[in-house]
């Protein structure tokens, strides 16, 4: 008897990640699944629960859930919703679990397990945990042996990330979700097999046409995730690519916050422009002294003029925007989840800096699953070096050419596996069966 509780079983990141999985698990012979809606039933609400988050409402809800006599209770949004977070403070089932739909520890002694993915933790967690990739690799070999298939079981964690959680980490081999979403319909220019429908000649002509058009760098994350440390990256992209246009979201419900962010970003962009103009003047002066002629002139028109803000879009409009983007930018230290998944689902390259994330490296894991590759450990550098690498990667992949074609082709070919929770390196299926089996195995073992 397994219960899943959330205030977001609707058009919300948590609901979209879990509903497909629940539909599968409800047909499992070995599980009796209870779906517990902790919302007020009002679309767009914060999930105030049965009449509110007061003590009486919490007591009533806790008694109702306890009466189900569940073996396991899985929470989808602890930390995102006040009511479900209040529920999670109580012991309503012998075993209680949190899902990575909200990527961080609950810090509660009443939550026993945190379900995540090898693609989000593994060697990807090395720099965040302050360990080198070599140390993580040694631990992985000692735990299972080189080349062994990862085993999904209660306690299947490595120690590089465990210290950051009050719960015991349970790392599934795949992503742990089934994302069946009709809104994610590829544009008609893409073939049914996920490859571009154009001929090589047509693609070359399109690239020639794109060579001098503006390049769209899109960051579709909410304002809460726009950390000051990320401002320098946005400014650096504008300075590095004279054709770059950066598109950011603007929410009318956060006008004061937005105005402060706008001023802060403007200051970073202006500083980058001054540095770029100084470098250009120095280069021209050196060229004149050496008799080689002028190399380039300072930037004219202003970098800030290439920053655009758009109001929130509908689901389909949002997806189409990401399909039109040349590259999607994942911010740090708190990056995207479902929005990154959507970008990868339409074959748009995503650039991220996993080493600068303070939570699970969701974007790196999703990229690995979409491109059907293994996540590899990497040497960790000073944060400024990672920012420089981020800018260089974004500019390189946004430009027309072989790299852009290669990345988009790989993402489109791996689309089905990504949406159905498959793991990187060929470790996940494309029909959701592997994800269903992972969850059934974990739930059965946890209840034993």
Residue ranges and their predicted role:
Residues 72-83, 87-108, 315-362:
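A donor-sugar binding/catalytic signature common to diverse glycosyltransferases
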Residues 53-59, 307-321, 335:
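Conserved active-site histidine-acidic residue motif and adjacent donor-binding/catalytic loop
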Residues 221-222, 252, 260-263, 284, ...:
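C-terminal amphipathic helix plus adjacent low-complexity
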Residues 91-195:
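Active-site-proximal region of nucleotide-activated glycan assembly enzymes
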Residues 9-29, 174-284, 297-313:
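Conserved catalytic-core segment of nucleotide-activated headgroup transferases in glycan assembly
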Residues 45-52, 143-146, 286-297, 421-430:
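Intrinsically disordered, low-complexity regions enriched in glycine and serine
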Residues 165, 322-323, 327, 331-421, ...:
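Catalytic binding pocket for nucleotide-activated donors in carbohydrate/polymer assembly enzymes
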Residues 4-47, 51-68, 72, 244:
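Phosphate-binding active sites in nucleotide-utilizing proteins
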């Amino acid at each position: 008897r397994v219960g899943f509780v959330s205030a977001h079983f609707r058009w919300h990141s948590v609901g979209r990640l879990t509903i497909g999985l629940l539909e599968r698990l409800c047909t499992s012979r070995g599980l009796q699944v209870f779906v517990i809606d902790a919302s007020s039933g009002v679309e767009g609400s914060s999930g105030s629960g049965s009449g509110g988050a007061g003590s009486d409402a919490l007591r009533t809800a806790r008694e109702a859930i306890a009466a189900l006599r569940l073996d396991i209770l899985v929470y989808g949004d602890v930390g995102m919703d006040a009511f479900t977070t209040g529920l999670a403070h109580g012991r309503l089932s012998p075993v209680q679990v949190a899902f990575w739909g909200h990527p961080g520890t609950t810090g509660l002694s009443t939550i026993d397990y945190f379900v995540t993915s090898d693609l989000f933790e593994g060697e990807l967690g090395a720099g965040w945990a302050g360990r080198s990739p070599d140390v993580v690799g040694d631990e992985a070999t000692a735990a299972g042996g080189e080349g062994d298939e990862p085993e999904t079981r209660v306690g299947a964690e490595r120690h590089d990330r465990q210290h950051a959680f009050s719960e015991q980490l349970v790392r599934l081999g795949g992503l742990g979700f089934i994302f069946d979403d009709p809104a994610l319909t590829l544009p008609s220019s893409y073939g049914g097999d996920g490859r571009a429908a154009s001929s090589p000649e047509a693609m070359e002509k399109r690239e020639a046409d794109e060579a001098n058009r503006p390049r769209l760098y899109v960051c579709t994350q909410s304002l809460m995730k726009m950390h000051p440390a990320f401002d320098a990256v946005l400014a650096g992209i504008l300075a590095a690519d004279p054709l770059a246009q950066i598109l950011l979201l603007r929410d009318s419900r956060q006008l004061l916050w937005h105005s402060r962010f706008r001023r802060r970003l403007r200051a970073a962009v202006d500083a980058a422009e001054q540095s770029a103009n100084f470098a250009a003047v120095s280069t021209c002066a050196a060229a004149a002294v050496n008799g080689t002629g002028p190399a380039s002139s300072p930037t004219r028109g202003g970098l800030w003029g290439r920053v655009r803000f758009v109001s929130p879009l509908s689901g389909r409009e949002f997806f189409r925007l990401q399909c039109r983007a040349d590259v999607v930018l994942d911010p740090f230290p708190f990056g995207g989840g479902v929005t990154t998944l959507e970008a990868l689902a339409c074959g748009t390259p995503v650039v991220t800096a996993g080493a600068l994330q303070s939570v699970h490296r969701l974007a790196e894991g999703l990229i690995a699953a979409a491109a059907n590759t293994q996540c590899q450990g990497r040497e960790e550098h000073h944060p400024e070096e990672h920012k420089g690498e981020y800018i260089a990667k974004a500019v390189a992949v946004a430009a027309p050419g072989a790299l852009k074609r290669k990345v988009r082709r790989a993402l489109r070919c791996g689309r089905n596996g990504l949406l159905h929770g498959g793991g990187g390196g060929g470790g996940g299926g494309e029909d959701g069966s592997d994800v269903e089996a992972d969850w059934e195995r974990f739930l059965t073992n946890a209840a034993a």
